[in-house]
Amino acid sequence: MAYEFAIIEKKEHLWIITLNRPERMNALHSPAHKELDEIFNNFQKDNEAWVAIVTGSGDRAFSAGNDLKYQAEGGKMESVPSGFAGLTSRYDLNK
């Protein structure tokens, strides 16, 4: 499946998840959080996936964190149950 804000590469038991918003230093906004939540849901369900590496595109930053510019521009702020980047509250993910 293709994603708008991330690139997924699968190599045997490894997933490489590349944040893909280099124009915003890979800062995460609500749509990206939702997308990453889906990605990590799929990673968790995949019995052949053992390890995920999260990296960022571009040469300025891995990730600037929360996209404050999106928020200041009035972007809709929503959270996902699995936490920031679809990952920080995912206590049941033991890969």
Predicted region positions:
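Generic detector of intrinsically disordered, low-complexity, polar/charged segments
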Residues: 53-55, 61-62, 80-83
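Glycine-rich loop at the start of a catalytic domain that most often binds anionic cofactors/ligands
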Residues: 59, 63-69
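An acidic, glycine-rich surface segment that forms the CoA-thioester-binding/catalytic face
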Residues: 37, 41, 68-95
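Conserved CoA-thioester-binding segment of acyl-CoA-metabolizing enzymes
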Residues: 1-59
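Phosphate-coordinating loops and pocket residues in cytosolic domains that bind phosphorylated ligands
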Residues: 27-30, 64, 73
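Short N-terminal binding/cap micro-motifs at the start of the first secondary-structure element
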Residues: 25, 61, 92-95
